[in-house]
Amino acid sequence: MHLSPQEKDKLLIVTAALLAERRLNRGVKLNHPEAMAWLSFLVLEGARDGQTVAELMQAGTTWLRRDQVMEGVPELVEEVQIEAVFPDGTKLVTLHDPIR
C-alpha cells in the first residue's frame, strides 16, 4: 500500500484520536496532542459526513470541555486549523477557542 504524506498524516490523526476517545471514555484527561488529534478527527469525519464548514466551526466549540483536558491545554489550543475533504473539494476549517 502506497500512501501520500497527507494520507499518512490523516492516519496518524485517526490513531491518536482513537486513543483520545478511549481515554475520554475512561474519564482520563487529554493532553495537548490528544486534544488536537480528537478535534482534528471530528472535523475530518464531519466533512466526510457532509457537514458544512460553518456547521463544523460551530460544533467544534462543543466537543471538548475544560474538565476533559489537562490543566493549561485550553490556553495552548486557541485555534485549530485543518484541511478537510468536503463533497465540493478541500477546505480549511478553523476552530477558535474550541475548549470551553
UniProtKB/Swiss-Prot annotation:
Provide the GO biological process annotations: urea catabolic process
State the EC number(s): 3.5.1.5
GO MF annotation, one: nickel cation binding
Report the main location listed first in the record: cytoplasm
- Which Gene Ontology CC terms are recorded? cytoplasm
What Gene3D superfamilies does this protein's entry cite?
Answer: Urease, gamma-like subunit
Q: Where in the cell is it found?
A: Cytoplasm
Does this UniProt record's set of keywords contain Hydrolase?
yes
Sorted alphabetically, the keyword list is: Cytoplasm, Hydrolase
What InterPro entries does UniProt report for this protein, alphabetically? Urease_gamma, Urease_gamma/gamma-beta_su, Urease_gamma_sf, Urease_subunit
The record's listing under CDD domains reads:
Urease_gamma
Kindly tell me the pathway this chain contributes to.
Answer: Nitrogen metabolism; urea degradation; CO(2) and NH(3) from urea (urease route): step 1/1
For this protein, the record's PANTHER family field holds: UREASE
Q: Would you tell me the protein name for this molecule? A: Urease subunit gamma
Organism, by scientific name, is Synechococcus sp. (strain CC9902)
Could you tell me the gene encoding this protein?
ureA
